[in-house]
Amino acid sequence: MSRSIRNQDVPELPRRRQVRTVGMSGNYWYVVEIDGRLKPRQVKRVRFWGQDIALFRDAAGELHAVEDRCPHRQLPLSQGFVEGGNLVCTYHGWKFDGCGRCTEIHHELGKGRTRLPRIRIRTYPVKAQWGLIWLFPGDPALADGTPLPTIPQLEGGRPWPFFPIDVTIKAHFSMIVENVCDFNHEYLHRHKRPFLQPILREWKQDADSVRVYYDTRFDGSPVAKLFMEGGARDLNEIEIWYQYPYQGSDIGGKYIHWLFMLPEDERTTRCFFVFLFGPIHVPIVNWKMPEFLRKPILWFTNKWYIEPLLGEDKWALELEQDGFERHPDAPQIELNPAISSFQRLSLEKWKAYQQSMERAGPKPAADPA
């Protein structure tokens, strides 16, 4: 479906309250951590829509993800430690391997037993790609057949360098989708000026994505003036997508961003931003930046400009979440007709996921091995 914004009525959004409570489908790969932050023999707790998961690397550096709950006394396994290939509960010393099996019990009632308790905690498919750790929280049988997003700039012999930005926002993921896809909040960034005078040209929706197209200017930001080719004066449009459950944008094939959201609960979303810069130029002379300077410049740009810019969105979104909780039944006047498409897609995907779980039936937290 493709629609122009011409002659469109301002839509009513009766689904607003509903979309602020749904989760995301577990049958996709989600970024749960930056790869370099989890060293061998380390364990961390991550969360997907109320599911606490212990993410750890064994002594050999292999990734594992298990339910963050020792079946003995229900303590979080993420409070324990890694020993060899096992995750050890810090309370009684019960050990679990990466397949979720109990491999050893430390105390005298467990030592020397020829048969350990036949229990197995839930495990999750997990892998590292592009410097990010991805986890599949849904039906594990679907993991191998579910692809990661296609990012050609990160493939091949010379992938574009980047430094991922990790931001936790105390807001529902649907608010974040609307924020990053709706350029009508230009006023919030009136001092940093990342885009100017945006005009929504059209939007398209299919079963898995919504794409919006804006005419806008990018030559107002200091990053554009300093490092973008020609000060970005020849760039005047952007394509933005909500390719469920991922979000991203493309400015002329030269400057691209991806947002990988990890919905922790109804009011908390961990966001992993990836900003990909193609041509970067030396200020004033407008020469192509030498390769050895690209990474330092990208790191500097993140710290000096992009992270403070995202901080403005975080501030506004957390206030929006607070306002929604205080006034959940207040009518919302929405002028951007594409917003209803984002909300509809989130609702449809969540409904389909719930139906798939109902067909599969309930699964016990700890199954017989």
UniProtKB/Swiss-Prot annotation:
Please provide the record's keywords in A-Z order.
2Fe-2S, Iron, Iron-sulfur, Lipid biosynthesis, Lipid metabolism, Metal-binding, Monooxygenase, Oxidoreductase, Steroid biosynthesis, Steroid metabolism, Sterol biosynthesis, Sterol metabolism
Q: Which GO terms describe its biological process?
A: sterol biosynthetic process
- Pathway the protein contributes to: Steroid biosynthesis; sterol biosynthesis
> Required cofactors, per record?
[2Fe-2S] cluster
Top EC class of this enzyme = oxidoreductase
User: Which positions make up the signal peptide?
Assistant: none
User: What intrachain disulfides are recorded?
Assistant: none
Q: Which InterPro entries match?
A: Cholesterol_7-desaturase, Rieske_2Fe-2S, Rieske_2Fe-2S_sf, VanA_C_cat
Which reaction is this enzyme known to catalyze? a 3beta-hydroxy-4,4-dimethylsteroid + 3 NADH + 3 O2 + 2 H(+) = a 3beta-hydroxy-4alpha-methylsteroid-4beta-carboxylate + 3 NAD(+) + 4 H2O; 4,4-dimethyl-5alpha-cholesta-8,24-dien-3beta-ol + 3 NADH + 3 O2 + 2 H(+) = 4beta-carboxy-4alpha-methyl-5alpha-cholesta-8,24-dien-3beta-ol + 3 NAD(+) + 4 H2O; a 3beta-hydroxy-4,4-dimethylsteroid + NADH + O2 + H(+) = a 3beta-hydroxy-4beta-hydroxymethyl-4alpha-methylsteroid + NAD(+) + H2O; a 3beta-hydroxy-4beta-hydroxymethyl-4alpha-methylsteroid + NADH + O2 + H(+) = a 3beta-hydroxy-4beta-formyl-4alpha-methylsteroid + NAD(+) + 2 H2O
One of its Pfam families is VanA_C
Q: Where are the transmembrane segments?
A: none
Record: residues binding [2Fe-2S] cluster:
C70, H72, C89, H92
For this UniProt entry, the molecular function terms from Gene Ontology, in alphabetical order, are: 2 iron, 2 sulfur cluster binding; metal ion binding; monooxygenase activity
Which intervals hold domain Rieske?
29-135
- What is the designated name of this protein? 4beta-methylsterol monooxygenase
